[in-house]
Amino acid sequence: MKEIRAYVQPHKLSQITMALMEIPGFPGMSIVDCEGFGRERTEHVQDYKPFLARKRLEIFAPDELVEVIFETIMRTARSGHHGDGKVYIIEAHEGGRISSGERDKDLG
């Protein structure tokens, strides 16, 4: 199991969500509002604030779905401009379902 964590432009969220929901067996996701900056920084003359609004997607998926989810996000979130975002794949060693108490090393 892996976590796919993506930082995307807020205006792309609905398009990304619709594309991900078309993937058979898509496990769902969490969305978090966040701010940040990367190599390309904006400079505001007044009230300097380098942080830009982003949406963070957190998806825990079985290994067999990771590549299709990753590629779907990369394709759908891309506008071709700086600041489109980043996608990471992170190893998730173990998880648990609170409602059932189920604990598994490959919990989907």
Predicted regions and their residues:
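Positively charged, small/polar-rich N-terminal and surface patches that mediate targeting and assembly
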Residues: M1-G108
